[in-house]
Swiss-Prot record:
Glycans are attached at residues 197, 261, 307, 346, 490, 536, 544. Pathway: Glycan degradation; xylan degradation. It comes from Arabidopsis thaliana. SUPFAM superfamilies: (Trans)glycosidases. Binds to and hydrolyzes insoluble and soluble xylan substrates. Keywords: Carbohydrate metabolism, Glycoprotein, Glycosidase, Hydrolase, Polysaccharide degradation, Signal, Xylan degradation. InterPro entries: GH10, GH10_dom, Glycoside_hydrolase_SF. GO terms for biological process: xylan catabolic process. Belongs to the glycosyl hydrolase 10 (cellulase F) family. It catalyses: Endohydrolysis of (1->4)-beta-D-xylosidic linkages in xylans. Gene3D superfamilies: Galactose-binding domain-like, Glycosidases. The active site is at residues 332, 439. Pfam families: Glyco_hydro_10. This is Endo-1,4-beta-xylanase 5.
């Protein structure tokens, strides 16, 4: 036996007896499976077997067998392993339950040949019913791995059923993404153009210009945008939503107690409003003790600290009421608990309550890091972030808050684990609340542009994700991780990727879709991204025949929508 010592107690058990291409698996892209959180008496069956590496051991409800965790926290080793190949994506799934205890964390861990542990996903398991555990791994080298269950309870006795590891090539994964994007981001619109007598108009020309996309890919900005006309022009020509990196934070607006200064934030907001750019508020408070104004930690009286904290909430939220799309009310309050330690366990929940009273229409986020990007995280895991939001919404008076999850997305400079990321988004999305990626970046590295595109496409292809903000900019902005343009505003390779995705996801109003109704069918169908459009219908032979109208294409309208246009001619 080998003991694990990595800073916290882990109990693990090796999965046994593997073979290829057999059994049952969960499709990681299935809408019916992706947000599944209920505990079921019997795991549902699936006919999905393509690309499957299947574990044959399945412990059923009426069996006396169970996988027991060694009480010493040791690994019980077996010799059999699974061979994984670099460049492939492996999606893991299993139905798990507890024989003893309840509501305990159960996760999957992959141990590589060099002894490194890769955490692949986790779930809260329950007693006497089955919960779906999902995750996965993207190996950076080919080799064999051992697969373990882990639990934070040394007394845990875990039963598992239908344990599977499904292999995808990157091309297969991308194809799945594209298919899902067509379902969740677009709808087919059929135009039927007729005269008042219902006779079809042959050869009508339909021009469609998008005025407001439903899904926004945005970018953060900082105070340097006030100092550079080139930065302002570069930004306004691309992005329709932003957040300010530091300019709205408490340690910026009140460096000295009682002396508030919102000059930079106000000026940046004015620039955004003048250019039709939405602003997401970041942040009212920050639960990290090191991220307070320097004078705040010196306050020893809890009543005094409460007074200045309430003053801060009232000040910033009243000032920007109705001007922002959302707020990080208490930033990173899963990782940190400064206000809870100083003011009580319900501090965060009570601050969300006050924020809701001050601006009930704004979306309020729990905003955390290492939730979707770092699979070794033990603090702000998807399960714990979900539970924090549930705790806030359960606080008296908070049930009507427009809640949302902010997954920051500070990725390491290496191949992202897309299978883990998708499973993490599934867990967060099971709340039924919007998810935004709020601070996406990655240190400079070879293939940065490839990795960033993979990350952004993974988010865009998930039904719970409603928008993305990257922490990036041109060289003059000082964003030294995701630099999108040089000092002359010429694109970097990563900048080319962002421009490509903006064009793909947000149809430019300067390049309208133009087509002619079919002379035989007298109707035309086009696939449109969800959003708002201006539509013009005219005819090249009839100069007086023209009509224009606004059109909103939404997911709620279904996969197909019929637009009937009646021409007065």
């Amino acid at each position: 036996m080998k003991n694990i010592n990595n800073g916290f107690f882990l109990c693990m058990l090796l999965l046994l007896w593997c073979f290829v291409h057999s059994g049952i698996s969960i499709d990681p892209f299935s809408p019916s499976d992706s947000l599944k959180t209920e505990c079921v008496m019997k795991p549902p069956r699936s006919s999905e077997t393509k690309g499957l590496l299947q574990f044959s051991r399945s412990v059923e409800d009426d069996s006396d067998e169970e996988w027991k965790i060694d009480g010493s926290g040791s690994i019980r080793e077996m010799t059999q392993r699974i061979q994984l190949h670099e460049g492939n994506i492996y999606s893991f799934s299993a139905w798990v339950k507890l024989r003893e205890g309840n509501n305990k964390k159960v996760g999957v861990v992959f141990r590589t040949e060099n002894g490194r542990f890769v955490h692949g996903g986790e779930v809260r398991a329950k007693k006497r019913c089955w919960t779906l555990l999902k995750g996965g791994i993207v190996p950076d080298v080919s080799g064999s791995v051992d697969i373990f269950f882990e639990s934070d309870d040394k007394e845990a006795k875990i039963s598992a059923s239908d344990v599977s590891l499904k292999q995808f090539s990157k091309q297969e994964w991308k194809l799945k993404q594209d298919q899902l994007i067509e379902k969740i981001r677009k709808s087919k619109v059929r135009f039927e153009v007729t005269y008042q007598n219902k006779t079809a108009v042959k050869g009508a020309v339909i021009s469609i210009e998008q005025t407001k996309p439903s899904f926004l890919l945005g970018c953060a900005m900082n105070f340097r945008i006030l100092q550079s006309e080139g930065y302002r022009n570069w930004f306004a020509s691309r992005f329709k939503i932003t957040s300010f990196t530091n300019e709205m934070k408490w340690y910026t607006t009140e460096k000295e107690r009682g002396h508030e200064n919102y000059t930079a934030a106000d000026s940046m907001l004015k620039f955004a409003e003048e250019n039709g750019i939405l602003v997401r508020g970041h942040t009212v408070l920050w639960d990290d003790p090191l991220m307070q104004p320097t004078w705040v930690p010196k306050i020893e009286d809890p009543n005094d600290l409460m007074n200045v904290t309430l003053n801060r909430i009232n000040s910033v939220m009243t000032r920007y009421k109705g001007k922002l799309t959302g707020w990080d009310v208490v930033n990173e309050n899963v990782h940190w608990d400064y206000f809870e330690k100083m003011l009580g366990a319900n501090a965060s929940s009570s601050f969300y309550n006050l924020a809701f009273k001050l601006d009930p229409d704004v979306t309020m986020f729990v905003n955390e890091y290492n939730t979707i990007e770092n699979r070794v995280e033990v603090t702000a895991t998807p399960v714990k972030v979900k539970e924090k939001m549930e705790e806030i919404l359960a606080y008296p008076g908070n049930m009507n808050i427009k809640g949302a999850i902010g997954a920051q997305g500070h990725f390491r400079p290496t191949q992202p684990n897309l299978a883990y990321m998708r499973s993490a988004l599934d867990t967060l999305g099971s709340l039924g609340l919007p998810i935004w990626l709020t601070e996406v970046d990655m240190p400079k590295c070879p293939n940065q542009e490839v990795y960033i595109e993979e990350i952004l496409r993974e988010a865009y292809s998930h039904p719970a994700v409603k928008g993305i903000i990257i922490f990036a900019g041109p060289e003059v902005s000082g964003f030294d991780k995701l630099t999108l343009a040089d000092k002359y505003f010429n694109n970097t390779a990563t900048g080319d990727v962002i421009d490509k995705l903006l064009k793909e996801w947000q149809q430019s109003s300067e390049i309208p879709k133009i087509f002619m109704t079919d002379s035989e069918n007298d109707e035309e169908e086009v696939s449109l991204l969800h959003g708002h459009y201006n539509v013009n219908v005219s005819h090249p032979w009839m100069k007086n025949m023209s009509t224009s109208f606004s059109l909103e294409v939404t997911k709620e309208m279904g996969q197909r929508q019929v637009v009937r246009v009646v021409i007065n001619a």
